[in-house]
Each structure stands twice: as structure tokens, then as C-alpha cells.
Amino acid sequence: MRDIVFAGNLIVDHIKCIEALPPRGELAKILHVYRSTGGCVCNTGIDLAILDPELAIGAVGVVGRDADGDMVLETLTRHGIDVSQVLRRSVTSFTDVLAERSTGSRTFVQFGGACAEFDIDDVPLDKLDCKLIHIGYVLLME
């Protein structure tokens, strides 16, 4: 039995660091780029796994059949999170993040992708076997 299962959004953040957000129609040079997992399932699940490595944690959701989906599954697995209930289809949901070095502010543009296809039929209620389930970012799911 798992202690907790996180269900919902599995997202990859595509972060572009820039000096400042340019005016509309103008160009900003990207200083550096990186990717990071995001969304409720990844953020909360990984944080909890770090705080208590003895917890049995599971993930439920949908990622794409792409490199971002691979990254999400590898990252969760590396933190000891069971990904056996994560489905693969479509394109992994992502957020483009413009992070301004000058102000520290961030601007987000989100692509629904696989998470937009996630619904109650994707939750294996008969196989969850957990003490607690947390469903996050419900309003981002379509």
C-alpha cells in the first residue's frame, strides 16, 4: 500500500532566462535555457520524497510520448516515486517560463498537452491502494 498518491498535472517547465521582458514586437536575447519538472504531481511528490524517503509515493497522470515525458518519468523514478499508473500519449504538457534576471519576475505561457486529456477514466480507482490521494491543479485540466 502506498502512503500517498499524487494525481493531476505532470508538466515540464522550459525556462528561458532573459535580461528583461521586451516590449511587444521586440526581441530579447536568451541568456540561458534549462528544463525542470513541474506541476502538482512532480513538485509535491518530489518535495515529499525528499523530506521523507521512507514514504511510499505514487503518481497518476498522463505524459507525452516524447523526451519531456521521458524526463518526467526518469525524475520521479529517481526520487523513488512509483510511476506505474502514469499513462503515455500525445505531447507532454509544458510551460514556457520567461525569467527576467533584472527583476526576478517570471512570465508563464502554458500548453495543455497530455494533461488536458487527463480525466477520471485515467484514474485506476481499483488499483490505487493508498492511504491518501491528492489531486492538484484541477482548474488547469480541461
Task: Label each region the model flagged.
Residues 60-65, 82-92:
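Beta-strand->loop->alpha-helix junctions that form or flank phosphate-binding loops
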Residues 1-11, 73-88, 100-142:
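Ribokinase/PfkB-type carbohydrate-kinase core domain
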